[in-house]
Every structure is written in C-alpha cells, then in structure tokens.
Regions:
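N-terminal Rossmann-like NAD(P) cofactor-binding subdomain of oxidoreductases
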Residues: 2-208
Length: 209
C-alpha cells in the first residue's frame, strides 16, 4: 500500500502469429516492465482479430493469453503506424535477409528500440548481440549504430541463436580458468524454424534415435 507503481513501457510484437511471436506473447503476459499495445504480422493477417485469426493456428501447449484475443493485427510493413505510440518492438518475422534488415532499420528510424529474434542483423559490427548477464557493456556500440542510422533514440539489438545462448554462459563462468579448447555438439529443434512434426512430415523419417 502506498508503493510507487512504475509505468510500463508500451511495446509492439511484430511477427505475432509465428511460433516465436506466440511465445513472446505468453512471456509478456502481466509483465512488470512491458505492456503489449500492438500486434503486427503479414499483410494477410492484418485487419483481423488476433483471437479469431489464431483459433486454429496456435502452436504452443500453453493456452493463448486472453489479453491478446481482441487485438486487431496490424500490417508489419506499415512501419509508421505500428511504431506510433510504442517505445520498443520485439521482432520475430519470417522474411528474406535484405528485407528483414531494411524492416528493422526502418523501425529503428522511427525512434523505437528494436529487439530482434532474427538472424539478419547479427553479424553487423554496430548491432550488439546481448546476453545480459555476460556482455551488457556491448550496448555501448549503440552510439555508433545511431550515427549510421541517423537516429536519436532508435536502435537495433539482437539476441544470439539458441546454441550460443545455451553454452556461452557456462564458458563465461569458467573463463578465468583459461579454457584452451572446447568441443561442442548441438542438436537443433525443428521448433527453431517455427514448425512442428505435424507440419513437417518428412522430418519423421529423418531422425536418428
């Protein structure tokens, strides 16, 4: 009682109909820092109510969050409209690499922070790839990126791929002991491509037990 209640940052999820977008919406439900105010996806999904659109497309075992169902999905390519009124977007869209780079930069130029789940910008020298517990200092490179993009507040930051984020924290903890060599073997889940066995039947006979 009487405690200060922090105002949450208004955000959009771009790519809200895909598997990663769905997972983001679950994670963002009742989030203490972020308030989802917009959902965006492909032109084919635009103008439809999210709950109706996803009735037979929801892929997660967890139920679709109630708060998402009444959102009218916007066209992800309508950058100005989606960016209006939000400070940050989570981006998880399926596009050609060049198109994706252009889209994320367009959002950044609307002065919003773009947190990307995509690989397109991961190799850019001035786009930080962050594991917060390990290399938060890399965010300093954002100033260089802003100069390139001509922005004051907008920038892009990316998350690493699923393999890197699984083992790098362990290596970081052991770094002081002087690791000289490491042997790594990763096994990629088909869910990483946003698909399931039901949607990818050719994979069923392509698994070595």
């Amino acid at each position: 009682k009487g405690m200060y209640k922090m105002e949450r940052t208004k955000i959009a999820v771009v790519g809200a109909t895909g598997m990663v977008g769905q997972r983001l919406l679950v994670l963002l439900e009742n989030h203490p820092y972020f308030e989802v105010v917009k959902l965006a996806a492909s032109k084919n999904s635009a103008g439809k109510k999210y709950g109706d659109l996803m009735e037979n497309k929801w892929k997660l075992d967890i139920k679709m969050p109630e708060y998402t169902k009444d959102f009218i999905v916007e066209d992800a390519m309508d950058v100005k409209s989606v960016a209006n009124g939000v400070k940050l977007i989570f981006c998880a869209v399926n596009l050609d690499k060049k198109e994706l780079v252009a889209l994320e930069e367009a959002y950044a130029k609307e002065e919003v922070v773009v947190v990307s789940n995509n690989s397109a910008n991961r190799m850019k020298a001035d786009v930080p790839m962050i594991i917060p517990e390990i290399n938060a200092k890399h965010l300093d490179i954002v100033d260089v990126q802003r100069k390139r993009l001509g922005t004051k507040k907008g920038f892009i930051v990316v998350k690493p791929n699923c393999s890197i984020q699984s083992y790098v924290p362990v290596f970081a903890a052991l770094k002081e002991y002087g690791i000289k060599e490491a042997s790594i073997c990763t096994y990629q889940a088909i869910s990483g491509s946003g698909r399931t066995f039901e949607e990818w039947p050719e994979m069923v006979e392509n698994i070595i037990p």
